[in-house]
């Protein structure tokens, strides 16, 4: 019998479907394991090989955990609302609903061909009214708690897309070539800032890549500083400025306010008013990226007004510049050009004074000095002296003095801004509120408020969504009077903010999720997806989850316990796959040529899961040859089947088998799938070399390989006499004594702190241990950019690098 992967894979996919093999049991007598993919947006271009990487990884873990006795929840669904589907619909002239249904069918077919062990009974779609009824319900809970509000605000408007973009979305759209401008619009906004501190502190509760945590910390942008009142004598008022460096107050030589600051025009004197107004209007046509880019030349206008420095009484000119944003701090800054790069550039351009107040090793007229590790100079008056004090002391001394004088107050600020939640488009969840003639706003009482089927779904030129043109849907009367519905829709992120909960209880019509089921399954044990979602989906979902926690809907503080970011698979030209480059490798194409098992194995064998790596067709052919070698263990020749023997294993083969089980178990647990596959290849080679067709060894191999290449393992498991699926078998165990490989685990420290471990043969020389330690990924990031000044090696136990900034 030859290895006919096409018929074998169809056979076992049909078997799993018919027998509901991967149906998740509603039982609590087993330990649970919830493994989740970031569910896809079903695009018209279909899945390519890069998309399959994360799905393959989660499927391996799902199958592995089932074999270890876990009750596994491994679902799949579709994030189908939003701009991409609508843009494609406009481009092709096909209704987004029709496109979505077609694309979902195509995606599902590919995923099923890959043999992924999803429980398809739990499939969800964000465009299903039964699903988005609960998305709308959550919105109304936000509204009820004062966390959703409307506001006339300056927004990021994309004229080409005819919609508002959230701050987090602007960079992506600009990179795609869309122009984005600022304009005032009435918007629905979610008060994510109310949860800023919890979003920050609770990052300590989760096992996420440090890089993603840091991206969220930077986006939230917590800072401790002081709000200082600068008196404006000519206006009989003051200008409030927020600074994180009150210790440099004596070095402030001018103030800058944003063009949107409410006092911008008021502070402009008659001779400067026209110039100020023109500058303010020009700033409205720029995006924040254009205004704040580090390489952007500084621009600004002088208002003609002066403020008083409370530390030394000096008059400080007040300028308007677009590098200052109203959305952060107070929209006004004190400029200390000697010790801030932007302030120094601005001062140089407009010939403003530069005063050194932090002792610098060079002339601050020639270059800025921004380090905190020095001491204050030129910083004293009759009441206070900071001279000679380091930052750690001078900050508090100045803050205390300002608070005592009543001209300053310690405060905490965040860069995070409230989430602009409404979109002026058709293809999204309707926002379930009604506006009455008496000016009141009331929630829809009957959910879901369904999206009407309309023919003209293109965006309008008025700033309202196409729903504003559907009068029979838009207007109505009830017991409270005549009303007009909200025409904005929710953004594409809404449905993905809580989908992980709906998978737990997808058919519930009474609640978003049953409390007992939620308590059993939450939180998600392993969440796999791209790091590009760090400050979009991942932040939004954490926010909604915390609101639901406060409502008592969920029992955990965080939704996703462990996050793993898979690396991108590039095209064969080493570039990101894209239609424009012509380097996209469609999933269906390689499935037809090589089969699911080969694709699954190759995707995982390419390299470490977290790393970026290029596709190589020669590589998948090598994996196909490996599967053929596995096949020949049972079918050494076409038409002939080997007879497995029941004799005891030789001592060498016994040790080989137990070592393989141990290493493959460890590597699978750690998501080091490429090295697990390498160990399987070694094991197969040993089986062929030994010439032994030992049943125990062959069955052990099939059990180890089955999460990775399930179809061929099912077929061979049946061929050697089993009448039940291999999915019902337990994972093989190993004897530690037989698996011992004379290897030791070496702790690797950097400046005395444990940063990772490496394994090496006992007695390895110093140079081997140092080389292994330097290459260990968890260690390497602490060595990058550093100078190693000493290397300490304790044989078989420890490596310590003593480093300093290099």
Curated annotation (Swiss-Prot):
A motif ('KMSKS' region) lies at residues 576-580. Its EC number is 6.1.1.4. This is Leucine--tRNA ligase. It catalyses: tRNA(Leu) + L-leucine + ATP = L-leucyl-tRNA(Leu) + AMP + diphosphate. ATP binds at residue 579. It comes from the Bacteria. GO terms for molecular function: aminoacyl-tRNA deacylase activity; ATP binding; leucine-tRNA ligase activity. It is found in: Cytoplasm. Disulfide bonds: none annotated. Belongs to the class-I aminoacyl-tRNA synthetase family. GO terms for cellular component: cytosol. Keywords: Aminoacyl-tRNA synthetase, ATP-binding, Cytoplasm, Ligase, Nucleotide-binding, Protein biosynthesis. It is an enzyme of class 6 (ligase). CDD domains: Anticodon_Ia_Leu_BEm (cd07958), LeuRS_core (cd00812). Coiled coil: none annotated. NCBIfam families: leuS_bact. One of its GO terms (biological process) is leucyl-tRNA aminoacylation. A motif ('HIGH' region) lies at residues 40-51. Signal peptide: none annotated.
């Amino acid at each position: 019998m030859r290895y006919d992967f096409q018929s074998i894979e169809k056979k076992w996919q049909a078997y799993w479907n018919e027998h509901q093999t991967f149906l998740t049991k509603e039982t609590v007598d087993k330990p649970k394991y919830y493994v989740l993919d970031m569910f896809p947006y079903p695009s018209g271009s279909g899945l390519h090989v890069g998309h399959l990487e994360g799905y393959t990884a989660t499927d391996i873990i799902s199958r592995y955990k089932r074999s270890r006795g876990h009750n596994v929840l491994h679902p799949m669904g579709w994030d189908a609302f939003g701009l991409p589907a609508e843009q494609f619909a406009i481009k092709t002239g096909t209704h987004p609903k029709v496109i979505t249904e077609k694309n979902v069918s195509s995606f599902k077919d590919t995923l099923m061909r890959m043999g992924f062990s999803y429980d398809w009974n739990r499939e969800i779609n964000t465009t299903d009214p039964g699903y988005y009824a609960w998305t709308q319900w959550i919105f109304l809970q936000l509204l009820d708690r004062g966390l959703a509000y409307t506001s006339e605000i300056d927004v990021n408007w994309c004229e080409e897309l005819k919609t508002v973009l959230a701050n987090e979305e602007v960079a992506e759209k600009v990179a795609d070539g869309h122009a984005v401008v600022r304009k005032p619009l009435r918007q629905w906004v979610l008060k994510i800032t109310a949860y800023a501190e919890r979003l920050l502190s609770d990052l300590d509760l989760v096992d996420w890549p440090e890089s993603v945590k840091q991206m969220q910390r930077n986006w939230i942008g917590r800072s401790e500083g002081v709000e200082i009142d600068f008196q404006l004598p000519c206006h009989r008022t003051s200008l409030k400025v927020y600074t994180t460096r009150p210790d440099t107050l004596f070095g402030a030589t001018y103030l800058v306010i944003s063009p949107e600051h409410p006092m911008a025009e008021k502070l402009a004197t008659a001779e400067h008013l026209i110039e100020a107004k023109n500058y303010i209007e020009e700033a409205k046509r720029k995006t924040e990226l254009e205004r704040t880019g580090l390489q952007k030349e500084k621009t600004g206008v002088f208002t003609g007004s002066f403020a008083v420095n409370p530390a030394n009484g000096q008059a400080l000119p007040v300028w308007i510049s677009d590098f200052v944003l109203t959305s952060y701090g107070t929209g006004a800054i004190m400029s200390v050009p000697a010790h801030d790069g932007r302030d120094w550039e601005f001062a140089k351009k407009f010939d403003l004074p530069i005063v050194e107040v932090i002792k610098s090793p060079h002339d601050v007229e020639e270059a800025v000095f921004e380090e905190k590790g020095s001491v204050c100079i030129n910083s004293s008056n009759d009441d206070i002296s900071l001279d000679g004090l380091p930052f750690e002391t001078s900050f508090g001394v100045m803050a205390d003095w300002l608070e005592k004088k009543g001209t300053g107050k310690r405060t905490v600020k965040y860069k995070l801004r409230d989430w602009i939640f409404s979109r002026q488009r058709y293809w999204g969840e309707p926002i379930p509120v009604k506006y009455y003639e008496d000016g009141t706003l009331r929630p829809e009482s009957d959910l879901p408020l369904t999206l009407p089927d309309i023919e003209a779904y293109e965006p309008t030129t008025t700033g309202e969504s196409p729903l504003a043109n559907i009068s029979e849907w838009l207007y109505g009367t009830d017991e409270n009077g005549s009303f007009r519905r909200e025409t904005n829709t929710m953004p594409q992120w809404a449905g993905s903010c809580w989908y992980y909960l709906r998978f737990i209880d997808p058919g519930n019509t009474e609640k978003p999720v049953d409390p007992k089921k939620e308590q059993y399954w939450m939180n998600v044990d392993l969440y796999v997806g791209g790091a590009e979602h760090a400050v979009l989906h991942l932040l939004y979902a954490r926010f909604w989850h915390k609101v639901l926690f406060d409502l008592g809907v969920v029992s955990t503080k965080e939704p996703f316990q462990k996050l793993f970011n898979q690396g991108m698979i590039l095209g064969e030209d080493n570039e990101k796959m894209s239609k424009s480059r012509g380097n996209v490798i469609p999933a269906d194409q390689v499935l037809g040529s090589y089969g699911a098992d080969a694709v699954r194995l190759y995707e995982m064998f390419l390299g470490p899961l977290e790393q970026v790596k290029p596709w190589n067709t020669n590589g998948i052919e090598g994996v196909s040859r490996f599967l053929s070698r596995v096949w020949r263990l049972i079918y050494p020749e076409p038409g002939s089947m080997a007879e497995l023997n029941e004799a005891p294993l030789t001592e060498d083969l016994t040790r080989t088998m137990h070592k393989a089980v141990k290493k493959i178990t460890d590597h699978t647990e750690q998501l080091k799938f490429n090295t697990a596959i390498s160990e399987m290849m070694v094991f197969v080679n040993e089986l062929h070399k030994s010439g032994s067709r030992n049943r125990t060894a062959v069955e052990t191999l099939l059990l180890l390989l089955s999460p990775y290449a399930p179809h061929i393992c099912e077929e061979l498991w049946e061929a050697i006499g089993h009448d039940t699926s291999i999915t019902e078998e337990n994972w093989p165990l190993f004897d530690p004594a037989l698996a011992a490989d004379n290897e030791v685990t070496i702790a690797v420290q950097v400046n005395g702190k444990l940063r990772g471990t490496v394994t090496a043969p006992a007695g390895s020389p110093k140079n081997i241990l140092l080389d292994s330690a330097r290459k260990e990924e968890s260690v390497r990031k602490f060595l990058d950019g550093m100078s190693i000044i000493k290397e300490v090696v304790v044989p078989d136990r420890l490596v310590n690098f003593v480093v300093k900034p290099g």
